[in-house]
């Protein structure tokens, strides 16, 4: 640590803070009281993306959200893993929490099987979210989630880039460094009841946004006029004397 402090002082010790930087003022977005639905068209395969909003990075809700998201999906034993992907109810599905400074979101994405409608996929995903609200999950997932996150952090901190990113993310999100360091310890104290209360408040059936990516031509696409390109003579019959 002493050597690191000396290096920091050598290269950055002369920097002075800018006292005139304006403070970031965050606006509060309106609450979603009924599902917000949008259709997007294109040639790619159909899919859905669903999102629920919850408070920003400095809140206790953000820590609970990380655990809740892993209970929903962790690639192995989450609700989506066991009840949807392993049972092949859809082609594929996954979820994640995305923490931001002002407001965060829990996102679920899913791809339909052949002959399956996007609305059917939506309803299947909502069933798993309801199970989270109702506490229909193994409490052992909570300890397993924190242990996995701790292992991931230990591995990532072997990299200089990851260590630097941890500082950067803390700065961007406006979190105290002491809270960042103790985040996993606080997550280990999250209970099943905490998850249920959090999900009942933030993951309701009426406060999500959903994007239906449908296959088809986008009638509203704006075409850009292609610029005139000057032709380039390739001189295929010539050869460099240095070749």
Residue ranges and their predicted role:
Residues 1-20, 56, 87-242:
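Charge-rich, well-structured scaffold segments of protease-associated domains
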Residues 20-77, 109, 234-243:
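His/Glu-based metal-binding/catalytic segments typifying zinc-dependent metallopeptidases
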Residues 69, 86-87:
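Beta-strand-rich C-terminal secretin pore/gate domain
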Residues 81-82:
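Phosphate-proximal small/polar/acidic motifs at interfaces that engage nucleotide phosphates
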């Amino acid at each position: 640590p002493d050597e690191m402090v000396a290096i920091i002082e050598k290269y950055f010790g002369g920097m002075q803070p800018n006292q005139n930087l304006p403070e970031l003022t965050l606006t509060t977005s309106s609450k979603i009281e009924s599902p917000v639905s949008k259709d997007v068209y294109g040639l790619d395969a159909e899919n859905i993306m669903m999102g629920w909003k919850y408070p920003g990075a400095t809140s206790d809700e953000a820590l609970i959200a990380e655990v809740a998201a892993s209970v929903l999906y962790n690639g192995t034993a989450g609700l989506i893993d066991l009840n949807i992907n392993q049972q092949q109810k859809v082609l594929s599905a996954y979820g994640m929490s995305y923490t931001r400074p002002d407001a965060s979101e829990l996102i679920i994405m899913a791809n339909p099987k052949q002959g399956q409608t996007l609305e059917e996929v939506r309803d299947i995903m909502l069933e798993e979210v309801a199970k989270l609200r109702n506490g229909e999950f193994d409490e052992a997932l909570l300890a397993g989630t924190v242990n996995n996150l701790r292992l991931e952090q230990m591995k990532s901190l072997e990299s200089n880039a990851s260590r630097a990113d941890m500082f950067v993310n803390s700065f961007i999100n406006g979190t105290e460094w002491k809270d960042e360091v103790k985040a996993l310890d606080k997550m280990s104290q999250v209970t099943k009841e905490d998850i249920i209360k959090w999900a009942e408040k933030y993951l309701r059936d009426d406060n999500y946004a959903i994007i239906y990516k449908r296959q088809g031509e986008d009638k509203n696409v704006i075409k850009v006029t292609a610029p005139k390109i000057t032709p380039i003579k390739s001189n295929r019959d010539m050869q460099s004397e240095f070749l």
